[in-house]
Amino acid sequence: MAVPARRTSKAKKNKRRTHKGLTAPGLSRDSETGEYRMSHRISPDGTYKGRTIIEK
């Protein structure tokens, strides 16, 4: 089996991992309540795009 010729340094390892960071969720302001919520999700009161989806 193949074995690495040299140990991978911390700098080389960290440079490879630069794209693995977390991203913030896509929040948008609700036009009816003014609260921030995730895009394309039903709001906590059960409405989506001005229509009632879930009766409370």
From Swiss-Prot:
- Does Ribonucleoprotein appear among the keywords? yes
Chain spans, region Disordered: 1-56
> Short name of one Pfam family for this protein?
Ribosomal_L32p
**UniProt keyword annotation of Membrane present:** no
Gene Ontology cellular-component terms for this entry are:
large ribosomal subunit
Q: Where is the composition biased (Basic residues)?
A: 7-20
Keywords of this entry: Ribonucleoprotein, Ribosomal protein
- Composition bias of kind Basic and acidic residues appears in 29-38
UniProt cross-references to InterPro entries, sorted A to Z = Ribosomal_bL32, Ribosomal_bL32_bact, Ribosomal_zn-bd
A GO term, aspect molecular function: structural constituent of ribosome
Q: Name one GO biological process term.
A: translation
Xref: PANTHER family: 50S RIBOSOMAL PROTEIN L32 (PTHR35534), LARGE RIBOSOMAL SUBUNIT PROTEIN BL32 (PTHR35534:SF1)
Its family?
Belongs to the bacterial ribosomal protein bL32 family.
This protein is called: Large ribosomal subunit protein bL32A
Q: Which organism is it from?
A: Listeria welshimeri serovar 6b (strain ATCC 35897 / DSM 20650 / CCUG 15529 / CIP 8149 / NCTC 11857 / SLCC 5334 / V8)
* Phylogenetic placement of the source organism: Bacteria, Bacillati, Bacillota, Bacilli, Bacillales
| Gene designation per UniProt | rpmF1
